[in-house]
Amino acid sequence: MRTRAYFSALVAGLLCAAASAQQIDAAQYQGLSWRHIGPFRGGRTVAAQGVPTQPNVFYIGVNNGGVWKTTDYGHTWKPIFDQQSTGSIGNLAVALSNPNTIYVGSGEALHRPDLSTGDGMYRSDDAGVSWKHLGLRDAQQINTILVDPKNDKRIFVAVLGHPYGANTERGVYRSNDGGEHFEKVLYQDEHTGAIGLAMHPTDSNIIYASLWAARQAPWENGAFSGTGSGLFKSSDGGNTWQQLKKGLPDKGLGRIAITVAPSSPDRLYAQVSAGAETGTYRSDDAGANWFKVNDEERVSGRPDDFAEIKVHPTNPDIVYVANVATQRSNDGGKSWTAIRGAPGGDDYHGLWINPLNPDIILNAS
C-alpha cells in the first residue's frame, strides 16, 4: 500500500459562486478534472473534512502525519497538530453549528500487522490553533466521530480499542459536554470495538453503529475474527440499541461501513465484509430490511481496509465508495464507474462531500 498522502478536490462550480450574478454556461467546466493538491508525505490520509460555509477551508488527518489545514482550497497546507503527544490520526470532525470546534480521534483504526496507535480524543475551539486532550486515553484506535449538527458539545465516538490485545475502553461513547466526560453507550466485550457511526440528518437521536470483532498480531494476518461484529441502531440518542439483521449476512461478519442518505434518511447504504457475502448493501426502510445491490470486488474488495461510503446530499441514488479507485454509482448502488484512480491503484480512504455545494468532493488517499 502506498505511503504517499494524496488529497484531491473536485471543485466544479466554484467560479460560478464567485460570479453570482453572471450567467455562465456549465459546459465550460466539463473539462475540469481531479488534481493532486497535497500535502505530499505522511502516510495514509484517513480523514478529510471541509467547512460547508467556508468552501476554501479543508482539514485532513493522516495515520502517521497529524492534522493539516488549508484555507486556500488546498494550494497550501499547514500542520496544526505537531505539538500534541501523538501524530497518529484515526478521524476528525468539524462541528456544523460552530466550525471553530474541531474534534480529533487519535490512532488509526484498522486490524493489520503494521499500524500506529493514539492516546485518545482532542478538541480545538479556535479552528486548530490550540488543542485540549479530552480523555479516552486507552482507546488507542478511534475511527469515527459524530457531532450533533445543532449542538457542537454533543458527540459520539466509535472506539475500536487495542489492536493487539483485549481491553475494555472500546465501543461507542457519548459526550454531552464537548468531550469533558464520556459515557459508554454500546459495548459488546473486550474483543469487540466500534468502527462505524452514522446519524439521521434531522433527528440526531437516530444513530447507526457498527461493531467489529477482529485482531491480528504484527506477525500474523487475519488471525482472529470474533462473533461480536454487527450493525446496530438507536432511536433514543444512544440509550438503547437494537441489532439490524434482516437481509444482512449472519455468518462471517467483519467490518461494516454505514451511511445515511441526507435527502432521504430512510435510505441507508453499507459496505459489508462477510466472506462470500461481501458487498454493498442497501436499506430503504431505515435499516429494517437490507438487500445486496452489488458484489463487485472493485467496489467492495479488501473490505477490512476500505470501508468509506458516502451519499450525495440531494440525490439518494448517487453514491460514492473509496477503494483502490474511487467509484460512483448513479443508480442506487447497482452499477459503478471509477472516477478517480484505477484498479490496483492508489488506495483511497476518505471522502467528504460539501452539503451546500456537492460539486466539491474531497478524496483522500
Give, region by region, the residue ranges found by the protein language model.
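Positively charged n-region of N-terminal signal peptides that target proteins for export
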Residues: 1-5
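Beta-propeller blade termini and top-face loops
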Residues: 21-365
